[in-house]
Amino acid sequence: MRIVAVDIGGTMIKSGLWNGETFVELRETETRASEGGAALMERVKGLIHSYHDFEAIGISTAGEVNTEDGSIFYANSNIPGYTGMPVKQIMEEEF
């Protein structure tokens, strides 16, 4: 199974494609946290779209995640507007 893995940090977004044996197509871009949660989600979607032929997406993120609905339960003020962001819903609608 080919899986896009994304790690959203306070300063960098790191990603890679797991091909079942190892990570390939590793990428890294600035989070630009001060631009806010909505802009961050657009950056993440664009990054994921840069991969091809994947079957699943895994995301780890700064902040606390509500495991029931995949939204950000709490994020500090470094990413304005990130608390309450429905990350899972956004990704499901896009992909």
Predicted regions and their residues:
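Short glycine-rich, Thr/Ser-proximal phosphate-binding strand/loop in the N-terminal lobe
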Residues: 2-42, 71-74
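Glycine-rich beta-strand-to-loop/alpha-helix junction loops that act as flexible
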Residues: 57-63
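Short, basic and Ser/Thr-rich N-terminal targeting/leader segments
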Residues: 11, 53-55, 95
